Amino acid sequence: MRIVVKVGTSTLTHENGKLNLEIMEKLVRQIANLSNKGEEVILVTSGAIGAGMGKLNLTEKPKNLPQKQALAAIGQGLLIEIYEKFFNEYGKITAQLLLTREDFSDRKRYLNMSYTLSNLLKWGVIPVINENDTVAVEEIKIGDNDTLAALVASLVEADLLIILTDIDGLFDKDPRIYKDAKVIEVVEEFSDDLFKIAGGAGTKRGTGGMYTKIQAAKICYNSGVKMVIANGKIDNVLNRIAAGEKIGTTFLPMKNPISSRKIWIAFNAKVNGFLFVDEGAAKALVKHGKSLLPSGIVKTEGQYDVGDCVAVVDHQGREIARGLVNYSSEEVEKIKGCKTHDIESILGYKYYDEVIHRDNLVVLERGEKYGG
């Protein structure tokens, strides 16, 4: 079994921001045990900024990016040094990977990363992954390690993603407000209600709240990866989950997951523009799996070239699909709303009948509201 384990800052650190070495050692022991049983394990770890905070005795995470990056630069070396020391005690070799959004959005780098991780796992090495917080600016930030872990799980076609946090799972309502709140044991399908009850920001030392974990579950759902959210301080939690024990909240994957190439289009490729479509075109895409023709496009936004990824937005302002375009933004501006047989007379040439062919288009399971 191939398992990705994500552990968050709030689990890895004390209240004062310093690393909780006891928790880290227990985590490493469990991962080493899984590896010794023949499981392939990847660790996605937060904690670099928290480690930097502890080193400087800071108790509040700074808001501005340069200070966060400076703390990450201080903390990342300390974090990996501790992991390496603990894993060495169990005879395990680690490999550090620091990633940015560009490593996922660039198709060649994405595939190369897949080959690298496959080789490390084949050699019995434990890859330790974090976002490269020191260099990531807003344009290339993944933003949170819940999403990073889901993207990695999707990339390596993992069987299971375990997200360890400081709460017991996804509750049916906010447990900080409602004393009768209960953990949802199994989620089989996605609905807007999951995002509504997921809440917002994380803790003082962390980035991802429950909302980001639901977004991660959405990626896993479409990728065919089972995901579990559980409390990282439960005794032997990783081995128990891997053995099938019901702990926390389990998100089941869809029965017919999207192909790996379409997963890349849906969740990894950089969105360079937006195509706004009428009701008929939206129905053709979502209900009937058709290609997007120019006749259904009412507006285009952004600058994009042939082969770039764009988001498709319906008449209600919801993002319903993503796909790779056959025409540039300048060309789409000229042919939007026209029939396919008019493309050549308008442009002087015709590459394709479709602006996005259905083979290069992914309908999203849940439409996010367009924010442009």
From Swiss-Prot:
Pfam families the UniProt entry points to: AA_kinase (PF00696), PUA (PF01472)
Segments passing through the bilayer: none
Reactions it catalyzes: L-glutamate + ATP = L-glutamyl 5-phosphate + ADP
Domain of life: Bacteria
Primary residence: cytoplasm
EC numbers: 2.7.2.11
GO cellular component: cytosol
Residues that bind substrate: S46, D133, N145
Keyword annotations of the record: Amino-acid biosynthesis, ATP-binding, Cytoplasm, Kinase, Nucleotide-binding, Proline biosynthesis, Transferase
Annotated pathway: Amino-acid biosynthesis; L-proline biosynthesis; L-glutamate 5-semialdehyde from L-glutamate: step 1/2
GO molecular function, one term: ATP binding
Subcellular location: Cytoplasm
An annotated GO BP: L-proline biosynthetic process
Keyword Ribonucleoprotein: no
Group of enzyme by EC: transferase
Family as reported in the entry's similarity comment: Belongs to the glutamate 5-kinase family.
Function: Catalyzes the transfer of a phosphate group to glutamate to form L-glutamate 5-phosphate.
Protein name: Glutamate 5-kinase
Organism: Caldanaerobacter subterraneus subsp. tengcongensis (strain DSM 15242 / JCM 11007 / NBRC 100824 / MB4)
Gene field: proB
